[in-house]
Amino acid sequence: VQDTLITILSEKTLPIPELDREIQAVRGFNVIATANNRDKGVNDLSSALKRRFNTVILPLPDTIDEEIDIVRRRVESFEAVMDLPAEKPALEEIRRVVTIFRELRQGATEDGKTKLKTPSGTLSTAEAISVVNNGLAMSGYFGDGRLNATDLVSGIIGAVVKDPVQDQVIW
């Protein structure tokens, strides 16, 4: 796969040997790729492939309020597009998810009194958004239309437990 990407990025062509064809990229062709530092795959990117990308590191939001605001805005835009039969999520439920994610990422509770095991997954802001969106769908289609902890729990489990063996102690 990496060799194919190098050809595409360097020569701006996609060879298709089975069809004895090559497809030339149009002007302005770009590839945008994302990666998480904690979410590593089986093979690291080769140095040749790394040289063909510009790396932009996006840190996690500095404060919990900043992260809550990001999640709230993205969830509201998702809800508007999907037209879910659920009420606008309560800020307290978004705060609950973001707090759980931040505490697990940091390996300690917000007050610093209790140490926690960190999971193998990233628990990114994007995953928090996904958990709340999933909870909204659950509450809208299978619940009473009001987002609550019961609607969120399956999404939280899925985000936290990426490796059932390694993450068993966390859950």
Residue ranges of model-derived segments:
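Conserved AAA+ ATPase small/helical "lid" subdomain
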Residues: 68-71, 75-151
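Context-gated lysine
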Residues: 12, 40, 50, 88, ...
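Residue-identity detector for glutamine
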Residues: 2, 24, 106, 166-168
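Canonical AAA+ ATPase core
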Residues: 1-84, 136-141
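Proline-rich intrinsically disordered, low-complexity coils
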Residues: 59-61, 85, 119, 158, ...
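Short acidic/histidine-centered micro-motifs embedded in hydrophobic/aromatic stretches
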Residues: 8, 100, 155
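C-terminal engagement/docking regions of AAA+ P-loop ATPases
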Residues: 140-171
